[in-house]
């Protein structure tokens, strides 16, 4: 990658002295963000990454670092890039728009229900999924009490505080869960504009993710403090099935959280703790065979988010803060971008005849990629693999302002 030097004479590319891996700063404007780790953010062909900046929407060519500004101005919410066309979908003013990166023009593709928000686009770009709250939507007592910006707002170049964790977050989640507000999960057809109510519930539902390969299969989450509920669910949005629970807790204080799809849509992965803050796994479930594999993590390697390489052979973790006020599962010396290589634990002779129906266990062999000792984890790094599997993209405030970075999976020569 070739990039101009950023302000303050900081290098845009360097070898991390603690790990020997090459790091590149992809963004050039302070305050630039990558998307949440489950939101697909690559254009068709996988060569360009979507980033959001104060100016609007940018694309960066991963191989060269070249940045294209493709949309001027703030949009309500970037949903993802389309897996088929590479269009950038966003939700603004009650409508879903598709931005063509080549022409830099947007077109309105669907009108949302009143109070509706779109969260996911399916793999063939025919449906969007979202939710809305039924009836009265103004509940200030349930709103997050986030840190407020300074008078006049943030100025270009100002460090912007991360909004992923804040002092009132856990109490807010308890208030919202207890409220049992009626909600609707809906789909909207991006060709005809037809809206369908798919699920009515008083559970707090969120984190909608369509399968990367199956256009009617949707994963979603029951929100709230994770040890109080069974979180990860699957649903056919064509009405041909009832919601199916992916992981059922069997232990007090057990949690399954931060779920995501494998690149081929075969597996669901999630952060599994048995119990919270004590024993750490990456749980997995094959949606077609029902097979389960639990990958055990060594101490002090728990990460806020995990991700899996496109070929399914490697995993990443974006580390965690040692302060339990920031993360329940506080770990010592875990402020790193990690690479994990899975190793199946070999079955011993004489196992029971029904062992094929049991959970397969594996261990993770860790490697440190990026030293995040100066990163403030109130901003979650949201690490994810590039489509070629050669880089892990993440965001960080480790050098002050929020910027977007990539670390090379292979160690520098």
Provide a role label for each language-model segment.
Residues 380-413:
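Blade-level signature of beta-propeller repeat domains, shared across WD40, Kelch, NHL, RCC1
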Residues 1-24, 174-186, 352-360:
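Blade/loop signatures of beta-propeller domains
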Residues 36-38, 54-97, 112:
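Blade-loop segments of beta-propeller domains
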Residues 49, 87-88, 127-128, 217-218, ...:
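Hydrophobic beta-strand positions that form the internal "hydrophobic ladder"
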Residues 2-13, 18-55, 208:
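Beta-strand-rich domains and repeat architectures in extracellular enzymes and scaffolds
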Residues 74-76, 83, 90-184, 193, ...:
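Asp-box/WD-like beta-propeller blade repeats and closely related beta-sheet repeat scaffolds
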Residues 271, 277-280, 296-364:
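Loop/turn-rich, solvent-exposed surfaces of beta-rich toroidal or solenoidal domains
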Residues 56-59, 94-98, 137-143, 180-184, ...:
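Structural motif
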